Amino acid sequence: MQGRLSAWLVKHELVHRSLGFDYRGIETLQIKSEDWYSIAVILYAYGYNYLRSQCAYDAAPGGLLASVYHLTRIQYGIDQPEEVCIKVFVPRTNTRIPSVFWIWKSADFQERESYDMLGISYENHPRLKRILMPESWIGWPLRKDYIAPNFYEIQDAH
């Protein structure tokens, strides 16, 4: 079943894949990494002016990594704002996804956390560096194939 936003994207010949709806009825779309930035700009212009959250996950050991964006279209006089979930999948060998920091400033720390925990590299992010782990930490702790070190030293926060 195709949702309203998916139908609009098809009408304007924008490449995507509909993944259906979640349990709350929110449409979920898959966008290719190379198309993500231009579609994000279009979604912002279309009225999706609020990035509610961005997160990432490891789909399977040795498999794809996903960056997930929950966007909301907030308008005055509307009781129920429209929401959409966008998923961008990348292989472990090329984890580059365009940053949407310049569209939605709230992506700043969220993209940094996804980088820190899963190693997804957000291109053109102004401060893409570790946010939770020390800079010297080796590896990406939330990847399913991550092997935790036998010993690590707890350091004071900076």
UniProtKB/Swiss-Prot annotation:
Under PROSITE patterns, the record lists: COMPLEX1_30K (PS00542)
Give the gene symbol.
ndhJ
What keywords appear on the UniProt entry? Answer: Chloroplast, Membrane, NAD, NADP, Plastid, Plastoquinone, Quinone, Thylakoid, Translocase, Transport
Localisation: Plastid, Chloroplast thylakoid membrane
Q: Which GO terms describe its biological process?
A: photosynthesis, light reaction
What PANTHER family does the entry give?
NADH DEHYDROGENASE [UBIQUINONE] IRON-SULFUR PROTEIN 3, MITOCHONDRIAL, NADH DEHYDROGENASE UBIQUINONE IRON-SULFUR PROTEIN 3
Q: What is its main location?
A: plastid
Name the Enzyme Commission number(s) assigned to this protein.
7.1.1.-
Q: How does it sit in the membrane?
A: Peripheral membrane protein
Q: Which organism is it from?
A: Piper cenocladum
SUPFAM superfamilies for the chain = Nqo5-like (SSF143243)
* Family to which the UniProt record says this protein belongs: Belongs to the complex I 30 kDa subunit family.
- Protein name, entry field: NAD(P)H-quinone oxidoreductase subunit J, chloroplastic
